[in-house]
Amino acid sequence: MAIRKYKPTTPGRRGSSVSDFAEITRSTPEKSLLRPLTKSGGRNAHGRITTRHRGGGHKRAYRVIDFRRLDKDGIPAKVAHIEYDPNRTANIALLHYVDGEKRYILAPKGVTQGTPIESGPTADIKPGNNLPLRNIPTGTTIHNVELRPGGGAKLARAAGMSIQLLGKEGPYATLRMPSGEIRRVDVRCRATVGEVGNAEQSNINWGKAGRMRWKGRRPTVRGVVMNPVDHPHGGGEGKTSGGRHPVSPWGQPEGRTRKPNRPSDKLIVRRRKTGKKR
């Protein structure tokens, strides 16, 4: 993937860029793997906003991605197409299995049209192949990693993400996460070899607010320009600074967004590095 920069022909084009989609081989998705996707606008089942700054955007269809690949052990497949997916930053690869079934997976870096793909404990250590952690050599770069055996991949699924397998001891494998956190995961969990493709996606300059609205992203308003009824930093005469340490609209101090005392915390060997010492 390469980034194409626009010339400043209009204010919205100035500084903006777009992917050249050179890796994409087909523009229409596989119909049998599409599902309807209803927009929530950031609301839950009670109609209350649970995620701010969401709403609008272009209509999308959900592409069903195979995050398990457990039932395809020993069945060879070949990459038929690399496609764009509007629901994620990574591209997706359409696999044609020899038994006739078609499935989508996240497109790893280096996997192109015609690349053979396989799953299972005896699969080769090549990008796109899916194996249990116990069968992957130490030091290998992996992505699409499960947290629980058979639970489906949860870690390193965004464009350009990868995890390094540091070692294996007893029933656990030690992984270095993209954030720098080091944690242990059951060796029966499965992972895909290689890193997620489309890494240049993070270098795209969106250029104007309208392109973010197409993606369903609404404006993020600063608390200091709100009224006191809307935010703890609101109000004041003129451009005031807020007069207190940064907080959320509900008064919670900024940072520390991780939920404390999660059951899986006992498997964390070393925490990620944060910007501030607390």
UniProtKB/Swiss-Prot annotation:
Listed Basic residues bias regions: 45-57, 269-278
Family (UniProt): Belongs to the universal ribosomal protein uL2 family.
Alphabetical list of Gene3D superfamilies matching this protein: 2.30.30.30, Nucleic acid-binding proteins (2.40.50.140), Ribosomal protein L2, domain 3 (4.10.950.10)
Protein name listed in UniProt: Large ribosomal subunit protein uL2
UniProt feature coiled coil, ranges: none
Function: One of the primary rRNA binding proteins. Required for association of the 30S and 50S subunits to form the 70S ribosome, for tRNA binding and peptide bond formation. It has been suggested to have peptidyltransferase activity; this is somewhat controversial. Makes several contacts with the 16S rRNA in the 70S ribosome.
Region (Disordered): 1-20, 25-57, 224-278
Keyword Transferase: no
UniProt cross-references to HAMAP family, sorted A to Z: Ribosomal_uL2_B
Keywords carried by this UniProt record: Ribonucleoprotein, Ribosomal protein, RNA-binding, rRNA-binding
PANTHER family: LARGE RIBOSOMAL SUBUNIT PROTEIN UL2M, RIBOSOMAL PROTEIN L2
Organism: Nocardia farcinica (strain IFM 10152)
MF (Gene Ontology): rRNA binding; structural constituent of ribosome; transferase activity
Record text on subunit structure and interactions: Part of the 50S ribosomal subunit. Forms a bridge to the 30S subunit in the 70S ribosome.
GO terms under cellular component: large ribosomal subunit
GO biological process terms held by the UniProt record: cytoplasmic translation
